[in-house]
Amino acid sequence: MKEIIIDPITRLEGHGKIAIFLNDAGEVENAYLQIPELRGFEKFCIGRKAEDMPLLTSRICGVCPVAHHMAGTKALDTAFNVEPPEPAKKLRELMYCGYFIYDHTLHFYYLGGPDFVVGPDAPPEKRNILGVIEKAGLDVAKEVIKHRAYGQRITEIIGGKATHPVCGLPGGISKPLSEENRQEIEKMATSAVEFAKFSLKLFHDIVLKNTRYVELIKSDAYTLRTYYMGLVDEHNKVNFYDGKIRVVTPDGREFAKFEAKDYLEHIAEHVEPWTYVKLPYLKKVGWKGFVDGPDSGVYRVGPLGRLNAAEGMATPLAQEEYELMYKTLGGKPVHSTLAYHWARLIELLYASERAVELVKDPEITSTNVRNKPGEPGEGVGVVAAAR
């Protein structure tokens, strides 16, 4: 048996390596994605002040700290038995839209773009962000950099810092939004809508008009029939910041819908000796190993997971593209892993549209941004992370 090691892996957040094992005929027998770093957050957070959790847990990741910060903040809301005022909820969600704008822009153009935009036949040394710039042009590169910065600026204005925000408090946030900052965010969010539309057009022109790409997306090699999980609002539309957790089966039927506080009734974790990452699965289905299908408890999250678990998008332009994706790829749910890139751009458009809605809300500059915490207890918080 022959072993091939790829270490380190590039184009991902964090550290990882891939181990591939070939049989005597030279065919792949097994392949493992290994996460070799021990993080230890679950241990060193024990005994710390609850109020420190949004700041400590945001250090889990430098790319998606907003998700960890906001999940921790929402856990404090329930732990201190306090409901934030509506203006505070809207400001939190607006900051969260900024996070999705910069994260989805980063992922599509920097991490996914080298394969789609540059092309799978390009030499490895060309499949990077510089190759994307060379293929798409310098003007496109400038727009990518600008709108990623816009997302970070929105996060910074509300969160206090673009990376590792510091605004979350039990019962609200640390400061209101000034009219001057509101106008700045409105301009950036409006521009982000146009950028998202442009990004989808680029995807249509380069990917969907190429028969080979579409065949690759639909191919069995990139198909996994799993359960899907996502956060949805009261109408089962995609929501990043709030709502219930919805799970659908591989054929699209609702399997479960529950509050964050009940997550341990539905989700368990499996441990393997070759990786430090725990492997969540649906408790009521059970762990059957690394297999797909309705009898396996494996489920997927992220952009495609959310779109499959929901019944639509809550903004008009994103809804149009949502319907087009399922029509093009043969109905719902879509099981193609490569469709994550299309779903990501649909969410980029939704985040931008939603940011415009929120920043134009008359309550967004209200000074009523925090309610007094109540008696302390236990709390669980959930948000949808971008990846």
Which functions belong to the PLM regions below?
Residues 1-387:
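Active-site bordering "gate/hinge" segments
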